[in-house]
Amino acid sequence: MKYLRAALLAALFLFSTVISAWAEDVVLRSRDGAVELSGTLLGFDGQFYRVETKYGELTVDGSGVVCEGPGCPSLTNFVAEMSISGSSTIGEVLMPALVEVFALQNGLKAERITEDDTHFIYVLRTDEDAVVARFAFRVSSTDEGFADLLADEADLVMALREIRPGELELAEEAGLGTLDDVNRSRVLALDAMTVIVSPVNPISAMSISDLARVLSGDITNWRTLGGPDAPISIHMRDAQSGIAQAVEDRVLRRAAVELRDGVNRHATNGELAQAVADDQLGIGVANYSEVGNSKALALTGTCGFSLRANRLTIKTEDYPLTAPMFLYIPARRLPKLAREFLAYTRTVPAQIITRRAGFVDQAPEEITLNAQGDRLANAVRVADGDAGLSNLKRLIDTLSPLRRLSTSFRFEPGQTRLDAQSRSNVQQLARAMEAGIYDGRKLMFVGFSDGEGPADGNLRIARERAQAVKLAVENAVEASNLSQVVLTTDAFGEAMPMACDDTSWGRQVNRRVEVWVR
Protein backbone atom coordinates (compact mmCIF):
# COMPACT_ATOMS: atom_id res chain seq x y z
CA MET A 1 0.00 0.00 0.00
CA LYS A 2 2.89 2.39 0.70
CA TYR A 3 4.03 2.00 -2.92
CA LEU A 4 0.49 2.67 -4.11
CA ARG A 5 0.25 5.89 -2.12
CA ALA A 6 3.67 7.02 -3.27
CA ALA A 7 2.79 6.33 -6.89
CA LEU A 8 -0.53 8.11 -6.46
CA LEU A 9 1.21 11.24 -5.18
CA ALA A 10 3.68 11.05 -8.02
CA ALA A 11 0.88 10.74 -10.54
CA LEU A 12 -0.72 13.93 -9.28
CA PHE A 13 2.43 15.86 -10.22
CA LEU A 14 4.09 13.96 -13.04
CA PHE A 15 1.53 12.55 -15.45
CA SER A 16 0.54 15.10 -18.08
CA THR A 17 -1.52 13.65 -20.91
CA VAL A 18 -4.30 14.66 -23.20
CA ILE A 19 -6.81 13.89 -20.46
CA SER A 20 -5.60 16.93 -18.51
CA ALA A 21 -6.72 19.09 -21.41
CA TRP A 22 -10.31 18.44 -20.38
CA ALA A 23 -9.76 19.75 -16.83
CA GLU A 24 -11.38 23.17 -17.38
CA ASP A 25 -14.56 24.73 -16.05
CA VAL A 26 -17.74 24.35 -18.08
CA VAL A 27 -21.40 25.14 -17.68
CA LEU A 28 -23.97 22.69 -19.05
CA ARG A 29 -27.33 24.35 -19.58
CA SER A 30 -30.53 22.63 -20.69
CA ARG A 31 -31.81 23.85 -24.03
CA ASP A 32 -34.80 25.56 -22.42
CA GLY A 33 -32.51 27.26 -19.90
CA ALA A 34 -34.34 25.80 -16.91
CA VAL A 35 -31.47 23.67 -15.59
CA GLU A 36 -27.82 24.62 -15.22
CA LEU A 37 -24.89 22.51 -14.07
CA SER A 38 -21.35 23.79 -13.57
CA GLY A 39 -18.11 21.99 -12.85
CA THR A 40 -14.83 20.72 -14.24
CA LEU A 41 -15.00 18.79 -17.50
CA LEU A 42 -13.30 15.42 -17.05
CA GLY A 43 -14.10 13.92 -20.43
CA PHE A 44 -16.31 13.85 -23.50
CA ASP A 45 -16.89 10.77 -25.66
CA GLY A 46 -18.66 12.50 -28.52
CA GLN A 47 -22.06 12.01 -26.91
CA PHE A 48 -21.78 12.29 -23.12
CA TYR A 49 -20.03 14.85 -20.92
CA ARG A 50 -18.27 13.66 -17.77
CA VAL A 51 -18.17 16.50 -15.23
CA GLU A 52 -16.87 16.84 -11.66
CA THR A 53 -19.50 18.87 -9.81
CA LYS A 54 -20.34 19.75 -6.22
CA TYR A 55 -22.61 16.68 -6.34
CA GLY A 56 -19.75 14.42 -7.39
CA GLU A 57 -18.84 13.05 -10.82
CA LEU A 58 -21.81 13.13 -13.21
CA THR A 59 -22.33 11.89 -16.77
CA VAL A 60 -24.66 14.08 -18.85
CA ASP A 61 -26.19 13.35 -22.27
CA GLY A 62 -24.88 16.03 -24.60
CA SER A 63 -27.98 15.98 -26.81
CA GLY A 64 -30.01 17.73 -24.11
CA VAL A 65 -27.62 20.49 -23.06
CA VAL A 66 -25.55 23.36 -24.39
CA CYS A 67 -21.94 23.57 -23.20
CA GLU A 68 -20.44 26.95 -22.35
CA GLY A 69 -16.95 27.74 -21.13
CA PRO A 70 -13.29 27.38 -22.13
CA GLY A 71 -13.30 23.61 -21.66
CA CYS A 72 -16.15 22.86 -24.06
CA PRO A 73 -15.09 20.44 -26.82
CA SER A 74 -15.84 20.86 -30.49
CA LEU A 75 -18.96 18.96 -31.51
CA THR A 76 -18.23 19.10 -35.23
CA ASN A 77 -14.57 18.03 -35.18
CA PHE A 78 -14.66 15.63 -32.25
CA VAL A 79 -11.43 13.79 -31.46
CA ALA A 80 -11.61 10.64 -29.34
CA GLU A 81 -9.17 10.96 -26.43
CA MET A 82 -7.97 8.05 -24.30
CA SER A 83 -5.04 7.78 -21.90
CA ILE A 84 -3.43 4.44 -21.07
CA SER A 85 -0.96 3.95 -18.23
CA GLY A 86 0.89 1.09 -16.58
CA SER A 87 3.25 -1.77 -17.32
CA SER A 88 6.07 -1.04 -19.73
CA THR A 89 6.10 -4.73 -20.70
CA ILE A 90 2.65 -4.27 -22.22
CA GLY A 91 2.97 -0.65 -23.28
CA GLU A 92 6.26 -0.72 -25.14
CA VAL A 93 5.52 -3.49 -27.66
CA LEU A 94 2.10 -5.13 -27.50
CA MET A 95 -0.23 -2.14 -27.24
CA PRO A 96 1.52 -0.13 -29.99
CA ALA A 97 1.31 -3.15 -32.31
CA LEU A 98 -2.41 -3.52 -31.60
CA VAL A 99 -3.10 0.20 -32.09
CA GLU A 100 -1.24 0.32 -35.41
CA VAL A 101 -3.01 -2.72 -36.89
CA PHE A 102 -6.39 -1.54 -35.53
CA ALA A 103 -5.87 1.78 -37.31
CA LEU A 104 -4.86 0.05 -40.55
CA GLN A 105 -7.92 -2.21 -40.53
CA ASN A 106 -10.16 0.82 -40.03
CA GLY A 107 -8.63 2.80 -42.88
CA LEU A 108 -6.78 5.18 -40.57
CA LYS A 109 -3.18 6.33 -40.39
CA ALA A 110 -1.38 5.97 -37.05
CA GLU A 111 1.40 8.42 -36.20
CA ARG A 112 3.47 7.87 -33.08
CA ILE A 113 4.74 11.01 -31.33
CA THR A 114 7.34 10.34 -28.63
CA GLU A 115 7.45 12.91 -25.84
CA ASP A 116 10.08 11.29 -23.57
CA ASP A 117 11.20 7.86 -22.39
CA THR A 118 7.85 7.05 -20.77
CA HIS A 119 5.29 9.13 -22.69
CA PHE A 120 4.11 8.81 -26.29
CA ILE A 121 0.90 9.52 -28.20
CA TYR A 122 -0.70 7.76 -31.15
CA VAL A 123 -2.56 10.18 -33.40
CA LEU A 124 -5.07 8.47 -35.71
CA ARG A 125 -6.01 10.30 -38.92
CA THR A 126 -8.27 9.73 -41.89
CA ASP A 127 -6.98 9.71 -45.46
CA GLU A 128 -8.03 13.38 -45.58
CA ASP A 129 -5.63 13.99 -42.66
CA ALA A 130 -8.43 14.73 -40.21
CA VAL A 131 -7.51 13.73 -36.64
CA VAL A 132 -10.10 11.32 -35.20
CA ALA A 133 -8.32 9.98 -32.10
CA ARG A 134 -5.41 10.47 -29.75
CA PHE A 135 -4.30 7.56 -27.58
CA ALA A 136 -1.82 8.80 -24.96
CA PHE A 137 0.48 6.29 -23.26
CA ARG A 138 2.51 6.42 -20.10
CA VAL A 139 4.68 3.31 -19.76
CA SER A 140 6.06 2.78 -16.28
CA SER A 141 4.80 0.11 -13.87
CA THR A 142 1.60 -1.63 -12.86
CA ASP A 143 1.67 0.27 -9.55
CA GLU A 144 1.80 3.65 -11.24
CA GLY A 145 -0.89 2.66 -13.72
CA PHE A 146 -3.38 2.08 -10.91
CA ALA A 147 -2.22 5.29 -9.22
CA ASP A 148 -2.85 7.25 -12.42
CA LEU A 149 -6.33 5.76 -12.68
CA LEU A 150 -7.13 6.74 -9.10
CA ALA A 151 -5.81 10.24 -9.79
CA ASP A 152 -8.16 10.48 -12.81
CA GLU A 153 -5.12 10.67 -15.10
CA ALA A 154 -5.77 7.45 -17.02
CA ASP A 155 -8.68 5.70 -18.72
CA LEU A 156 -7.07 2.26 -18.93
CA VAL A 157 -4.51 0.46 -16.77
CA MET A 158 -2.00 -1.99 -18.23
CA ALA A 159 -1.19 -4.50 -15.47
CA LEU A 160 1.00 -7.57 -15.11
CA ARG A 161 -0.87 -8.69 -12.01
CA GLU A 162 -4.39 -8.68 -10.67
CA ILE A 163 -5.61 -5.62 -8.83
CA ARG A 164 -4.86 -5.78 -5.11
CA PRO A 165 -7.54 -5.47 -2.39
CA GLY A 166 -6.36 -2.00 -1.33
CA GLU A 167 -6.45 -0.71 -4.90
CA LEU A 168 -9.85 -2.31 -5.43
CA GLU A 169 -11.24 -0.57 -2.36
CA LEU A 170 -9.82 2.83 -3.36
CA ALA A 171 -11.23 2.45 -6.87
CA GLU A 172 -14.71 1.67 -5.54
CA GLU A 173 -14.53 4.67 -3.20
CA ALA A 174 -13.55 6.85 -6.17
CA GLY A 175 -16.60 5.71 -8.13
CA LEU A 176 -14.59 3.72 -10.68
CA GLY A 177 -16.63 0.55 -10.21
CA THR A 178 -15.63 -2.93 -9.07
CA LEU A 179 -12.50 -3.36 -11.15
CA ASP A 180 -12.22 -7.13 -10.76
CA ASP A 181 -15.64 -7.66 -12.37
CA VAL A 182 -15.62 -9.30 -15.78
CA ASN A 183 -16.67 -6.08 -17.54
CA ARG A 184 -14.04 -3.98 -15.75
CA SER A 185 -11.01 -6.17 -16.42
CA ARG A 186 -9.95 -8.19 -19.42
CA VAL A 187 -6.98 -10.34 -20.28
CA LEU A 188 -5.08 -8.83 -23.19
CA ALA A 189 -2.47 -11.58 -23.56
CA LEU A 190 -0.95 -14.42 -21.59
CA ASP A 191 2.45 -14.79 -19.97
CA ALA A 192 3.95 -16.75 -17.10
CA MET A 193 6.35 -16.39 -14.21
CA THR A 194 9.36 -18.51 -15.09
CA VAL A 195 12.15 -19.52 -12.73
CA ILE A 196 15.46 -18.79 -14.47
CA VAL A 197 19.10 -19.67 -13.81
CA SER A 198 22.38 -19.47 -15.71
CA PRO A 199 22.72 -21.88 -18.66
CA VAL A 200 25.71 -23.49 -16.89
CA ASN A 201 23.71 -24.24 -13.74
CA PRO A 202 23.10 -28.04 -13.52
CA ILE A 203 19.67 -27.60 -11.89
CA SER A 204 16.84 -28.28 -14.39
CA ALA A 205 13.72 -28.23 -12.20
CA MET A 206 12.45 -26.82 -8.92
CA SER A 207 9.28 -27.06 -6.87
CA ILE A 208 7.27 -23.93 -6.09
CA SER A 209 7.72 -24.68 -2.40
CA ASP A 210 11.50 -24.68 -2.81
CA LEU A 211 11.28 -21.47 -4.83
CA ALA A 212 9.49 -19.79 -1.93
CA ARG A 213 12.13 -21.11 0.48
CA VAL A 214 14.92 -19.74 -1.73
CA LEU A 215 13.32 -16.32 -2.11
CA SER A 216 12.65 -16.08 1.63
CA GLY A 217 16.19 -17.07 2.57
CA ASP A 218 15.27 -20.42 4.10
CA ILE A 219 17.44 -22.09 1.43
CA THR A 220 20.68 -20.21 0.76
CA ASN A 221 22.96 -22.86 -0.79
CA TRP A 222 22.60 -24.63 -4.14
CA ARG A 223 23.71 -27.89 -2.51
CA THR A 224 20.30 -28.15 -0.80
CA LEU A 225 18.72 -28.29 -4.26
CA GLY A 226 21.18 -30.79 -5.74
CA GLY A 227 23.55 -28.19 -7.13
CA PRO A 228 27.09 -27.08 -6.23
CA ASP A 229 28.15 -26.14 -2.70
CA ALA A 230 27.80 -22.40 -3.27
CA PRO A 231 25.58 -19.54 -2.09
CA ILE A 232 22.45 -18.63 -4.05
CA SER A 233 22.31 -15.13 -5.52
CA ILE A 234 18.77 -13.80 -6.06
CA HIS A 235 17.86 -11.41 -8.88
CA MET A 236 14.46 -9.69 -9.12
CA ARG A 237 12.78 -6.83 -10.95
CA ASP A 238 12.26 -3.56 -9.08
CA ALA A 239 9.69 -3.78 -6.29
CA GLN A 240 7.09 -1.67 -8.14
CA SER A 241 7.07 -3.84 -11.27
CA GLY A 242 4.14 -6.10 -12.02
CA ILE A 243 6.23 -9.28 -12.22
CA ALA A 244 7.87 -8.65 -8.82
CA GLN A 245 4.50 -7.95 -7.23
CA ALA A 246 3.01 -11.06 -8.87
CA VAL A 247 5.77 -13.14 -7.27
CA GLU A 248 5.00 -11.50 -3.94
CA ASP A 249 1.24 -12.09 -4.25
CA ARG A 250 1.24 -15.60 -5.71
CA VAL A 251 4.39 -17.26 -4.39
CA LEU A 252 5.60 -15.58 -1.21
CA ARG A 253 2.28 -14.59 0.33
CA ARG A 254 0.73 -18.02 -0.27
CA ALA A 255 3.73 -19.59 1.46
CA ALA A 256 3.39 -17.06 4.33
CA VAL A 257 6.96 -15.79 3.86
CA GLU A 258 8.64 -12.55 2.77
CA LEU A 259 11.43 -11.82 0.31
CA ARG A 260 14.82 -11.92 1.99
CA ASP A 261 17.10 -8.89 2.19
CA GLY A 262 20.06 -8.39 -0.13
CA VAL A 263 18.25 -9.17 -3.39
CA ASN A 264 19.73 -7.79 -6.63
CA ARG A 265 17.11 -5.53 -8.24
CA HIS A 266 16.90 -4.71 -11.95
CA ALA A 267 15.04 -1.95 -13.77
CA THR A 268 13.97 -3.91 -16.85
CA ASN A 269 13.08 -7.49 -17.78
CA GLY A 270 15.98 -7.64 -20.20
CA GLU A 271 18.48 -6.56 -17.55
CA LEU A 272 17.11 -9.18 -15.14
CA ALA A 273 17.38 -12.04 -17.63
CA GLN A 274 20.90 -11.08 -18.70
CA ALA A 275 22.10 -10.67 -15.11
CA VAL A 276 20.92 -14.19 -14.26
CA ALA A 277 22.44 -15.60 -17.45
CA ASP A 278 25.80 -14.06 -16.48
CA ASP A 279 25.64 -15.17 -12.82
CA GLN A 280 26.50 -18.88 -12.50
CA LEU A 281 25.03 -18.91 -8.97
CA GLY A 282 22.07 -16.68 -9.72
CA ILE A 283 18.34 -17.33 -9.77
CA GLY A 284 15.42 -15.10 -10.69
CA VAL A 285 11.78 -15.05 -11.73
CA ALA A 286 11.18 -13.60 -15.20
CA ASN A 287 8.39 -13.29 -17.70
CA TYR A 288 8.17 -16.30 -20.03
CA SER A 289 8.23 -13.83 -22.93
CA GLU A 290 11.57 -12.36 -21.79
CA VAL A 291 13.77 -15.21 -20.59
CA GLY A 292 16.57 -14.03 -22.88
CA ASN A 293 19.85 -15.95 -22.59
CA SER A 294 18.99 -17.49 -19.22
CA LYS A 295 17.72 -21.06 -18.69
CA ALA A 296 14.12 -21.65 -17.65
CA LEU A 297 13.46 -24.35 -15.06
CA ALA A 298 10.57 -26.80 -15.07
CA LEU A 299 8.29 -26.85 -12.03
CA THR A 300 8.22 -30.21 -10.31
CA GLY A 301 6.79 -32.01 -7.29
CA THR A 302 7.64 -34.88 -4.98
CA CYS A 303 5.53 -37.36 -6.98
CA GLY A 304 7.66 -36.88 -10.09
CA PHE A 305 5.26 -34.81 -12.23
CA SER A 306 6.88 -31.80 -13.90
CA LEU A 307 5.47 -28.87 -15.83
CA ARG A 308 7.37 -26.60 -18.18
CA ALA A 309 6.16 -23.25 -19.46
CA ASN A 310 5.32 -23.21 -23.16
CA ARG A 311 2.58 -21.77 -25.31
CA LEU A 312 0.13 -24.61 -24.74
CA THR A 313 0.70 -25.10 -21.00
CA ILE A 314 0.25 -21.36 -20.50
CA LYS A 315 -2.94 -21.29 -22.58
CA THR A 316 -4.39 -24.31 -20.79
CA GLU A 317 -3.17 -22.97 -17.42
CA ASP A 318 -1.65 -26.40 -16.78
CA TYR A 319 1.52 -24.47 -15.91
CA PRO A 320 0.67 -23.14 -12.43
CA LEU A 321 2.46 -19.77 -12.54
CA THR A 322 0.60 -18.18 -15.43
CA ALA A 323 0.64 -14.37 -15.43
CA PRO A 324 -2.11 -12.86 -17.58
CA MET A 325 -1.63 -9.35 -18.94
CA PHE A 326 -4.60 -7.22 -17.95
CA LEU A 327 -6.39 -4.12 -19.10
CA TYR A 328 -8.47 -2.55 -16.32
CA ILE A 329 -11.35 -0.36 -17.46
CA PRO A 330 -13.18 1.95 -15.00
CA ALA A 331 -16.95 2.33 -14.95
CA ARG A 332 -17.07 5.33 -17.25
CA ARG A 333 -17.97 5.84 -20.89
CA LEU A 334 -15.13 5.81 -23.37
CA PRO A 335 -15.33 7.34 -26.86
CA LYS A 336 -16.81 5.10 -29.53
CA LEU A 337 -13.47 4.59 -31.30
CA ALA A 338 -11.84 3.62 -28.00
CA ARG A 339 -14.61 1.09 -27.35
CA GLU A 340 -14.11 -0.31 -30.84
CA PHE A 341 -10.39 -0.70 -30.12
CA LEU A 342 -11.14 -2.63 -26.93
CA ALA A 343 -13.51 -4.90 -28.84
CA TYR A 344 -10.79 -5.42 -31.47
CA THR A 345 -8.35 -6.74 -28.83
CA ARG A 346 -10.52 -9.87 -28.52
CA THR A 347 -10.67 -10.64 -32.24
CA VAL A 348 -8.75 -13.32 -34.14
CA PRO A 349 -6.53 -10.76 -35.94
CA ALA A 350 -5.58 -9.30 -32.55
CA GLN A 351 -4.52 -12.75 -31.33
CA ILE A 352 -2.23 -13.08 -34.36
CA ILE A 353 -0.64 -9.71 -33.57
CA THR A 354 -0.23 -10.76 -29.94
CA ARG A 355 1.71 -13.88 -30.92
CA ARG A 356 3.86 -11.99 -33.41
CA ALA A 357 4.71 -9.49 -30.66
CA GLY A 358 6.24 -12.35 -28.65
CA PHE A 359 3.43 -13.04 -26.21
CA VAL A 360 1.03 -15.96 -25.77
CA ASP A 361 -2.30 -15.28 -27.48
CA GLN A 362 -5.73 -16.52 -26.40
CA ALA A 363 -6.78 -18.15 -29.67
CA PRO A 364 -7.98 -21.70 -28.87
CA GLU A 365 -5.95 -24.62 -30.19
CA GLU A 366 -7.15 -28.21 -30.55
CA ILE A 367 -5.09 -31.08 -29.12
CA THR A 368 -5.75 -34.75 -29.85
CA LEU A 369 -5.70 -37.30 -27.04
CA ASN A 370 -2.82 -39.08 -28.78
CA ALA A 371 -0.71 -35.92 -28.37
CA GLN A 372 -1.20 -36.00 -24.60
CA GLY A 373 1.00 -38.96 -23.75
CA ASP A 374 2.35 -37.47 -20.51
CA ARG A 375 -1.16 -36.87 -19.21
CA LEU A 376 -2.24 -40.39 -20.09
CA ALA A 377 0.86 -41.79 -18.41
CA ASN A 378 -0.03 -39.85 -15.27
CA ALA A 379 -3.57 -41.23 -15.45
CA VAL A 380 -2.34 -44.82 -15.70
CA ARG A 381 0.09 -44.24 -12.84
CA VAL A 382 -2.58 -43.09 -10.37
CA ALA A 383 -5.40 -45.44 -11.43
CA ASP A 384 -6.15 -47.34 -8.23
CA GLY A 385 -8.04 -50.63 -8.15
CA ASP A 386 -10.87 -51.78 -10.37
CA ALA A 387 -12.83 -48.55 -9.88
CA GLY A 388 -9.87 -46.40 -10.93
CA LEU A 389 -9.15 -48.51 -14.00
CA SER A 390 -12.83 -48.51 -14.96
CA ASN A 391 -12.95 -44.71 -14.73
CA LEU A 392 -9.77 -44.44 -16.81
CA LYS A 393 -11.23 -46.75 -19.49
CA ARG A 394 -14.37 -44.62 -19.61
CA LEU A 395 -12.21 -41.50 -19.98
CA ILE A 396 -10.30 -42.93 -22.93
CA ASP A 397 -13.46 -44.24 -24.61
CA THR A 398 -15.21 -40.88 -24.16
CA LEU A 399 -12.41 -38.51 -25.11
CA SER A 400 -10.63 -40.44 -27.88
CA PRO A 401 -12.97 -39.20 -30.64
CA LEU A 402 -12.68 -35.60 -29.36
CA ARG A 403 -9.97 -32.94 -29.29
CA ARG A 404 -9.07 -30.90 -26.25
CA LEU A 405 -9.34 -27.13 -26.60
CA SER A 406 -6.53 -25.11 -25.07
CA THR A 407 -9.32 -23.11 -23.41
CA SER A 408 -9.52 -24.38 -19.82
CA PHE A 409 -11.03 -23.18 -16.56
CA ARG A 410 -9.62 -23.08 -13.06
CA PHE A 411 -10.72 -21.51 -9.82
CA GLU A 412 -9.39 -19.07 -7.24
CA PRO A 413 -7.60 -20.90 -4.40
CA GLY A 414 -10.19 -22.20 -1.95
CA GLN A 415 -13.08 -20.56 -3.84
CA THR A 416 -15.78 -21.44 -6.35
CA ARG A 417 -15.05 -18.28 -8.36
CA LEU A 418 -13.15 -18.71 -11.62
CA ASP A 419 -9.67 -17.20 -11.67
CA ALA A 420 -8.86 -14.20 -13.86
CA GLN A 421 -7.62 -16.12 -16.91
CA SER A 422 -10.65 -18.43 -16.76
CA ARG A 423 -13.08 -15.51 -16.50
CA SER A 424 -11.51 -14.17 -19.67
CA ASN A 425 -11.82 -17.62 -21.26
CA VAL A 426 -15.58 -17.55 -20.61
CA GLN A 427 -15.84 -14.36 -22.66
CA GLN A 428 -13.49 -15.62 -25.38
CA LEU A 429 -15.44 -18.86 -25.81
CA ALA A 430 -18.76 -17.02 -25.78
CA ARG A 431 -17.57 -14.61 -28.50
CA ALA A 432 -16.34 -17.56 -30.60
CA MET A 433 -19.75 -19.22 -30.29
CA GLU A 434 -21.47 -15.97 -31.29
CA ALA A 435 -19.25 -15.85 -34.38
CA GLY A 436 -20.43 -19.33 -35.36
CA ILE A 437 -16.99 -20.93 -35.04
CA TYR A 438 -18.46 -24.00 -33.32
CA ASP A 439 -21.72 -24.27 -35.24
CA GLY A 440 -22.50 -27.90 -35.99
CA ARG A 441 -19.99 -29.12 -33.41
CA LYS A 442 -20.20 -30.67 -29.96
CA LEU A 443 -18.49 -29.02 -26.98
CA MET A 444 -18.09 -31.11 -23.85
CA PHE A 445 -17.15 -29.44 -20.55
CA VAL A 446 -15.14 -32.04 -18.63
CA GLY A 447 -14.50 -31.73 -14.90
CA PHE A 448 -11.44 -33.00 -13.05
CA SER A 449 -10.48 -32.87 -9.38
CA ASP A 450 -7.53 -33.40 -7.09
CA GLY A 451 -7.05 -36.73 -5.34
CA GLU A 452 -7.78 -35.55 -1.81
CA GLY A 453 -10.77 -37.26 -0.21
CA PRO A 454 -13.11 -40.03 -1.44
CA ALA A 455 -13.17 -40.68 -5.18
CA ASP A 456 -16.98 -40.53 -5.34
CA GLY A 457 -17.00 -37.10 -3.71
CA ASN A 458 -14.30 -35.82 -6.04
CA LEU A 459 -16.26 -37.06 -9.06
CA ARG A 460 -19.37 -35.23 -7.84
CA ILE A 461 -17.44 -31.98 -7.27
CA ALA A 462 -15.83 -32.24 -10.72
CA ARG A 463 -19.24 -32.75 -12.34
CA GLU A 464 -20.69 -29.72 -10.51
CA ARG A 465 -17.78 -27.55 -11.64
CA ALA A 466 -18.23 -28.64 -15.26
CA GLN A 467 -21.92 -27.76 -15.10
CA ALA A 468 -21.14 -24.38 -13.52
CA VAL A 469 -18.65 -23.46 -16.25
CA LYS A 470 -21.06 -24.56 -18.99
CA LEU A 471 -23.75 -22.34 -17.47
CA ALA A 472 -21.34 -19.38 -17.23
CA VAL A 473 -20.49 -19.69 -20.93
CA GLU A 474 -24.17 -20.00 -21.90
CA ASN A 475 -24.99 -16.88 -19.88
CA ALA A 476 -22.15 -14.96 -21.54
CA VAL A 477 -23.43 -15.70 -25.06
CA GLU A 478 -25.44 -12.60 -26.00
CA ALA A 479 -26.20 -12.91 -29.69
CA SER A 480 -26.17 -16.52 -30.78
CA ASN A 481 -28.55 -19.37 -31.38
CA LEU A 482 -27.25 -22.02 -29.00
CA SER A 483 -29.20 -24.66 -30.92
CA GLN A 484 -26.41 -24.56 -33.52
CA VAL A 485 -23.93 -26.12 -31.09
CA VAL A 486 -24.31 -29.06 -28.72
CA LEU A 487 -23.10 -28.32 -25.18
CA THR A 488 -22.70 -31.23 -22.75
CA THR A 489 -20.83 -32.03 -19.54
CA ASP A 490 -18.98 -35.00 -18.12
CA ALA A 491 -16.51 -35.58 -15.29
CA PHE A 492 -13.71 -37.97 -14.42
CA GLY A 493 -12.70 -36.71 -10.99
CA GLU A 494 -9.10 -37.49 -10.12
CA ALA A 495 -8.49 -39.67 -13.20
CA MET A 496 -5.97 -37.44 -15.04
CA PRO A 497 -3.77 -35.45 -12.63
CA MET A 498 -1.48 -32.72 -13.92
CA ALA A 499 0.55 -32.21 -10.74
CA CYS A 500 1.23 -33.70 -7.32
CA ASP A 501 -1.56 -33.54 -4.76
CA ASP A 502 0.77 -33.06 -1.79
CA THR A 503 0.86 -29.25 -2.18
CA SER A 504 -1.83 -26.61 -2.54
CA TRP A 505 -0.27 -25.65 -5.89
CA GLY A 506 -0.64 -29.16 -7.26
CA ARG A 507 -4.20 -29.52 -6.05
CA GLN A 508 -5.14 -26.20 -7.65
CA VAL A 509 -3.70 -27.32 -11.00
CA ASN A 510 -5.64 -30.58 -10.84
CA ARG A 511 -9.00 -28.91 -10.07
CA ARG A 512 -10.07 -27.83 -13.53
CA VAL A 513 -12.67 -27.93 -16.26
CA GLU A 514 -11.47 -28.69 -19.78
CA VAL A 515 -13.34 -28.23 -23.06
CA TRP A 516 -13.30 -31.04 -25.62
CA VAL A 517 -14.74 -30.66 -29.12
CA ARG A 518 -15.93 -32.92 -31.90
Language model features with spans:
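Short loop/turn segments at strand-loop or loop-helix junctions that form parts
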Residues: 411-412, 445-450
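Bacterial N-terminal signal peptides
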Residues: 7-17
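Sec/Tat signal peptide C-region and signal peptidase I cleavage site
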Residues: 18-23
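Exported/periplasmic ABC-transporter solute-binding proteins
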Residues: 25-438, 463, 467, 471, ...
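Positively charged n-region of N-terminal signal peptides that target proteins for export
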Residues: 1-5
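Periplasmic OmpA-like peptidoglycan-binding domain that tethers envelope proteins to the cell wall
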Residues: 126-130, 139, 144, 448-518
